[in-house]
C-alpha cells in the first residue's frame, strides 16, 4: 500500500508540474502575442525628441493598450528617409521629415494619401568655446560670413542631396547675398565645393565634391555635431533645436535669411535649389516638419495611435522640453484619418501647393 501511495503522489506531482508548464507556456505565448514593433524613418534632427516620445508612448501603450511596443527607429537625412521607401522599397509605418514638402512631392499618392505639418525650426550657426574666433563670433555675430571665410577656419553643413538642413544651409548663404549685398555664396560655397548658382537658382550635383579641407559635408546635420564637439570642426549650420539639445554655443541669423519667419515666405522664395539626386527643384521657405503614416504600414492601426500621441499634449510637451516649437494647431492635408481630425486643422490642397 505504501508503494501505491508513493506512486499516486508522484503521479499527482507530475500532473501539477505539467499543468504549470502548460499554463506558463500559454502565458508566455499570450505575452509574446502582445509584443509589436513600429518602424519609423525620421529626420536626424528629430532623434532626441522622438526618442523621448517613443519612450513615453511605450509606457502609455503598455498601460492603456495592453501592448509592449518596440521601435525600429532609423534617423537619416529626410530625403534619404523618403528614398528608403520610394527607391529601396523598404517597409515602414511612419515617415517624419524636416521638410514637409518631401511627403507630397515624393510619397503622395503612391505611398500615402495624407500628411501633417507639426513643428518648426530655424537655421543657426553653432560652435563651441574652442572654435577659432569664438569670442569674436559671439561679440559680433553680424560678421559671421567674414569669420567663416578666413583661411584658418573650418565649417560644415549636411549634404543637400540627402538632407533638408543641407539644402537649407546653402539657400541661407544665397539669401545672405541678397540681404547683405555681398558675394557670400560664392565665397563660402562655390570656392569650396562644386555646388554652384546661376543668379538665385542653386544647383547641387548628385556627387558633392569639396575642394579643400576647410569645409566638411556629411549625410545628415547631426553627423557634424560630434566633429564640432571634439574640436575637429569650428562651425556648422544646424537647426536651433539641435544646437540647444547639445548645449552648443550658437548665433542666430537675421529673419530675412534664417528660414524661420512665415511672414517672409515670399522673400525666401526668391531662392531655389535643384538637387542632382532627385532632379527636383525646391524653393526656400519657412522650416516646417511633416509626418505621415504609409498606406502599406505593417502596423497601421498602432501607427495611427502613435501619430495621435505625437499630435496631442504629450507630443507638444516632449518637443517643448527639447527646444523645438510645435505648430498650434498642426495642419493636415489629404485623406486625413478620422482618429486625428480632432487634433489638427484640416485644409484642402490648392492648385500648385506641394
From Swiss-Prot:
Q: Where does tungstate bind?
A: 44-45, 78, 163-165, 221, 239
* Keywords per UniProt: Cell membrane, Membrane, Metal-binding, Molybdenum, Signal, Transport
**Chief place of localization:** membrane
GO CC terms in record: plasma membrane
Mind telling me which residue stretches traverse the membrane in this protein?
A: none
Describe its membrane topology. Peripheral membrane protein
**Extent of the signal sequence:** 1-23
Q: Where in the cell is it found?
A: Cell membrane
Instruction: List, in alphabetical order, the Gene Ontology terms for molecular function in this entry.
Output: metal ion binding; molybdate ion binding; tungstate binding
What's one Pfam family here? SBP_bac_11
GO BP term, example: molybdate ion transport
* PROSITE patterns, per database record: PROKAR_LIPOPROTEIN
Sites where the protein binds molybdate = 44-45, 78, 163-165, 221, 239
Return the similarity comment.
Answer: Belongs to the bacterial solute-binding protein 1 family. WtpA subfamily.
Q: What does this protein do?
A: Part of the ABC transporter complex WtpABC involved in molybdate/tungstate import. Binds tungstate and molybdate.
Give the NCBIfam families listed for this entry: PRK04168.1 (NF003196), tungstate_WtpA (TIGR03730)
Record note on quaternary structure: The complex is composed of two ATP-binding proteins (WtpC), two transmembrane proteins (WtpB) and a solute-binding protein (WtpA).
PANTHER family according to UniProt: MOLYBDATE-BINDING PERIPLASMIC PROTEIN, MOLYBDATE_TUNGSTATE-BINDING PROTEIN WTPA
Name of the protein in question: Molybdate/tungstate-binding protein WtpA
Q: What is the lineage of its organism?
A: Archaea, Methanobacteriati, Methanobacteriota, Thermococci, Thermococcales
Amino acid at each position: 500500500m505504501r508503494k501505491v501511495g508513493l506512486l499516486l503522489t508522484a503521479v499527482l506531482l507530475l500532473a501539477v508540474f505539467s499543468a504549470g508548464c502548460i499554463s506558463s507556456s500559454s502565458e508566455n505565448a499570450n505575452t509574446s502575442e502582445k509584443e509589436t514593433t513600429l518602424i519609423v524613418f525620421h529626420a536626424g534632427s528629430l532623434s532626441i525628441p522622438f526618442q523621448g516620445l517613443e519612450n513615453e508612448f511605450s509606457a502609455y501603450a503598455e498601460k492603456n493598450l495592453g501592448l509592449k511596443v518596440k521601435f525600429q527607429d532609423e534617423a537619416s537625412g529626410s530625403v534619404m528617409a523618403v528614398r528608403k521607401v520610394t527607391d529601396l522599397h523598404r517597409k515602414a509605418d511612419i515617415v517624419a521629415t524636416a521638410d514637409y514638402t518631401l511627403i507630397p512631392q515624393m510619397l503622395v499618392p503612391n505611398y500615402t494619401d495624407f500628411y501633417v505639418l507639426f513643428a518648426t525650426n530655424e537655421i543657426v550657426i553653432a560652435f563651441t568655446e574652442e572654435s577659432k574666433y569664438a569670442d569674436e563670433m559671439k561679440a559680433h555675430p553680424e560678421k559671421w560670413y567674414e569669420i567663416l571665410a578666413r583661411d584658418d577656419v573650418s565649417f560644415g553643413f549636411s549634404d543637400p542631396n540627402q538632407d533638408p538642413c543641407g539644402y537649407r544651409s546653402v539657400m541661407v548663404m544665397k539669401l545672405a547675398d541678397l540681404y547683405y549685398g555681398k558675394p557670400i555664396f560664392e565665397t563660402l560655397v562655390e570656392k569650396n565645393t562644386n555646388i554652384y548658382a546661376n543668379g538665385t537658382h542653386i544647383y547641387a550635383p548628385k556627387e558633392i565634391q569639396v575642394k579643400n579641407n576647410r569645409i566638411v559635408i556629411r549625410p545628415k546635420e547631426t553627423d557634424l555635431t560630434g566633429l564640432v564637439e571634439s574640436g575637429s570642426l569650428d562651425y556648422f549650420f544646424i537647426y536651433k533645436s539641435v544646437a540647444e539639445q547639445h548645449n552648443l554655443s550658437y548665433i542666430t541669423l537675421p529673419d530675412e535669411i534664417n528660414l524661420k519667419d512665415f511672414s517672409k515666405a515670399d522673400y525666401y522664395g526668391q531662392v531655389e535649389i535643384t538637387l542632382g539626386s532627385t532632379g527636383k527643384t525646391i524653393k526656400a521657405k519657412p522650416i516646417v516638419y511633416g509626418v505621415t503614416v504609409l498606406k502599406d504600414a505593417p502596423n497601421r492601426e498602432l501607427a495611427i495611435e502613435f501619430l495621435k500621441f505625437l499630435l496631442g499634449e504629450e507630443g507638444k510637451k516632449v518637443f517643448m522640453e527639447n527646444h523645438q516649437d510645435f505648430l498650434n494647431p498642426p495642419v493636415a492635408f489629404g485623406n486625413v484619418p478620422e482618429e486625428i481630425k480632432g487634433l489638427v486643422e484640416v485644409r484642402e490642397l490648392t492648385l500648385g501647393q506641394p
